[in-house]
A protein has these predicted regions:
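Compositionally biased, intrinsically disordered low-complexity regions
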Residues: 20-21, 83, 172, 203
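Generic structural motif recognizing short loop/turn segments at the entrances and edges of beta-strands
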Residues: 4-7, 70-72, 103-105, 115, ...
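Beta-strand/loop-dominated core regions that host nucleotide or nucleotide-derived cofactor-binding catalytic loops
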Residues: 1-14, 88-93, 191-202
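Carbohydrate-recognition loop of C-type lectin domains
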Residues: 37-155
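An aromatic-glycine-centered, glycine-rich loop/turn in mixed alpha/beta architecture
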Residues: 136-205
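Catalytic P-loop NTP-binding/switch module of NTPases
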Residues: 1-36, 43
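A generic structural micro-environment signature
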Residues: 9, 38, 42, 65, ...
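A broadly tuned preference for mixed-charge, low-complexity surface segments
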Residues: 24, 112-133, 167-184
């Protein structure tokens, strides 16, 4: 723009980052449920969880642990996965405010422990079914199951659930090769690194 014969150029010198999509209904409901916890600075688990989720719009879950009296460890999970150092610093700063925590508490923000696993299964279908269509349906179903595990912290990896998810219409039998049962701690995050579905045969039964 020209002002009094002076040309002004306005530009952003720093690349924008860290934006987020509009808050989804599940996250909004969770924040509303936790809101009464924010009225106290007595250091309840719910209060720390509420304030940690307020620190960044992409935080969808927070594990709150106290390994020793007076120390609170916060493990935030983002909608995009594990947090970076910037988010951890933000959460720690936000939850260390004296209006949030008791004076005797030391707050530490930590990265959730990633639990990698793979899914491999052998699928037998009915003879009159189209193998490609059944495989596509099974793949879609297991992708949804994997996403449900990754949406929050502490979701166990249960073989019977995987078999159930893969048992879509047209499937006669599912033989699961991996994974084995894995109980996931509340500060751990289940992360599927690969899915392999092998169409192993057909059945007339």
């Amino acid at each position: 723009d020209e002002i009094d014969n002076v040309d002004l150029l306005v530009s952003n010198l720093t690349a924008s980052s860290g934006g987020s999509e509009q808050e989804d209904d599940d996250r909004l409901r969770e924040r509303i449920r936790l809101a009464p916890e924010s009225f106290t600075n007595a250091g309840s688990r719910g209060a720390y969880r509420f304030h940690a989720m307020q620190a960044h719009p992409n935080i969808v879950d927070v594990a709150v642990l106290s390994p020793v009296p007076g120390t609170v460890d916060l493990y935030p999970l983002l909608s995009t996965g594990l947090p970076d150092g910037g988010v951890l610093t933000l959460v720690e700063s936000f939850c260390s405010d004296e209006k949030v925590r008791p004076l005797t508490d030391t707050v530490r923000a930590k990265t959730p422990v990633k639990v990698d696993y793979t899914i491999e299964a052998r699928i037998t279908i009915y003879r009159d079914q189209d193998a490609r269509s059944v495989k596509d349906a099974a793949n879609s179903a297991i992708q949804n199951w994997v996403a449900s595990r990754a949406a929050t912290l502490g979701r166990d990896i249960v073989p019977s659930q995987i078999i159930s998810a893969l048992s879509v219409s047209g499937v006669y039998q599912v033989e699961l090769v991996t994974p084995a049962l894995r109980v996931v701690a509340e500060n751990e995050w289940a992360n599927c690194t690969a899915i392999t579905l092998n169409m192993s045969g057909v059945s007339d039964d």
